[in-house]
């Protein structure tokens, strides 16, 4: 007997929601456990700009007394307004290899979205409007790097059999360029910088608001209008993203290019902290 339950910020149920992932992947040596406390805080809305943009709901499916599936559903009102759509989203999908459990779960989530006026659903997206947990892994092997999705190989089958269709493919690449190539690119970049008169500076974390304004300006001019699922983040969201990333780095790997003081490009690189998170088993400290 399957039963779906919905909830918002109940800590006990949120812990069950988060811990299901640990049960699902406990025998998978490549899985990287998320930090339990941070994940629960994010699901309560702390430092989560997506939850500020509209309603959301968590769903669990029980088979008897056992939790066998979960999903987060919600609405990004800012995105819908910008695109002129009525679209809901789902995120953090986890499910046993059981088509009926998937059906009960997604029926509950889709009905809730329909009841609040949505006529379409997309996912899985990031639960905090970031780049983590997007999509399902359909090809690849080994431990994922930071921010890359890692999911069960049968998830695409479950979600397609339920009735969703594939929207697009995302790819992640790995490379280790030879030293000669690095040196050549350095020379080319120095030449281009002098010829075209632009500067490249590291992010100044002491001026994070001003730096975020420049990054916001770049994003406003570079995000394509035809990406239905993506809207330019607000200034507050950009600032919050950098505040969140501060736990991983100090700004050393972020650069902003400017020409005559006007921002024209930026890039963010992160160390692969999954190498560390893997050994922490979801906890910053051994006792909690």
Segments (PLM) and residue ranges:
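A structural signal for short, well-ordered beta-strand segments and their strand-loop junctions
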Residues: 120-126, 167-174, 256
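Acyltransferase donor/substrate-recognition loop-hinge adjacent to the catalytic core
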Residues: 2, 149-229
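Flexible glycine/acidic-rich beta-alpha junction loops that bind and position SAM and/or redox cofactors
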Residues: 127-135, 176, 271-278
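An acidic- and aromatic-residue-enriched active-site/binding cleft used to recognize and process polar
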Residues: 74-78, 93-95, 126-128, 178, ...
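Generic start-of-chain signal for non-secretory N-termini
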Residues: 1-30
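A conserved beta-strand-loop-helix scaffold within acyl/acetyltransferase catalytic domains
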Residues: 21-64, 71-81, 202-288
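Acyl-donor binding region in acyl/amide transferases
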Residues: 81-163, 230, 283-288
């Amino acid at each position: 007997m399957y039963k779906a339950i919905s909830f918002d910020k109940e800590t006990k149920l949120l812990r069950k929601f988060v811990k299901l992932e640990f049960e699902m992947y406990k025998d998978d040596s490549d899985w990287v456990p998320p930090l339990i406390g941070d994940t629960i805080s994010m699901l309560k809305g702390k430092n989560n700009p997506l939850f500020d943009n509209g309603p959301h709901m968590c769903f669990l499916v029980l088979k008897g007394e056992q939790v066998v599936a979960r999903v987060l559903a919600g609405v990004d009102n800012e995105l819908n307004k910008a695109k002129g759509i009525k679209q809901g989203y789902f995120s953090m999908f986890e499910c046993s290899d059981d088509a009926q459990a998937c059906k009960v779960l997604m029926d509950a989530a889709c009905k809730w979205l329909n009841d609040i006026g949505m006529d379409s659903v997309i996912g899985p997206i990031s639960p905090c409007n970031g780049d983590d947990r997007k999509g399902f892994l359909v090809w690849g092997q080994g431990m994922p790097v930071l921010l890359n999705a890692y999911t069960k190989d049968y998830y695409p089958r479950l979600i397609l059999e339920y009735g969703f269709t594939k929207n697009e493919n995302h790819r992640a690449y790995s490379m280790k360029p030879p030293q000669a190539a690095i040196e050549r690119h350095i020379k080319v970049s120095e030449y281009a910088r002098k010829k075209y008169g632009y500067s490249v500076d590291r992010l100044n974390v002491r001026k994070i608001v001003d730096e975020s304004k420049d990054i916001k300006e770049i994003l406003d001019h570079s995000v394509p209008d035809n990406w239905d699922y993506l809207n330019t983040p607000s200034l507050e969201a950009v600032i919050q993203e950098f505040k969140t990333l501060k736990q991983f780095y100090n700004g050393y790997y972020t650069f902003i290019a400017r020409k005559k003081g006007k921002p024209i490009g930026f890039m963010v690189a992160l160390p692969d902290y999954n190498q560390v998170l893997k050994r922490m088993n979801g906890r910053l400290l051994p006792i909690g």
